[in-house]
Amino acid sequence: MEGALKEGRFGFEETAYLLLLGRLPNAAELESFQKQLAYYRTLPNNFVRDIILKAPSHDIMNSLARSVLNLASYDDQCDDISLPNVMRQCVQLISLFPMLSVYGYQAYTYKSGSSLYIHAPRPELSTAENILSLLRPDSSYSFWEAHVLDICLTLHAEHGGGNN
């Protein structure tokens, strides 16, 4: 994380790579991993409408769980526990969790009377930047907001799960 901070770049993707593979990526590996994450930031057709918007939940964890369970029905290899397939599923979930979280939040706030806006993720953005872009009505965010969120994502990834 210190290297990313010093160099003014985002560190979450590098940390995710480290946690999946047990070592830091070199520049080419990181770029390839970032491209994989961008590639998998796509939900099945009508998923947002049929799964997320039709039954909004005040509990984002409930919304995430329901979405992940439904995504399994779109995965022809969901029961394949080979290492390459499980790795693909991990990368795909890392890519999709931000979208599922933001879209779940947007669905709930819409149900509560706010305007609804659903933006598509942008492949050139980091995970932190995409979260902020998806979350805001005008997709705007500042450099510092994105970096603070990236640090938060990195710390949560490095320090375990649970409700922390």
Where are the model-predicted features located?
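Hydrophobic alpha-helical bundle cores within soluble ligand-binding/oligomerization subdomains
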Residues: M1-N164
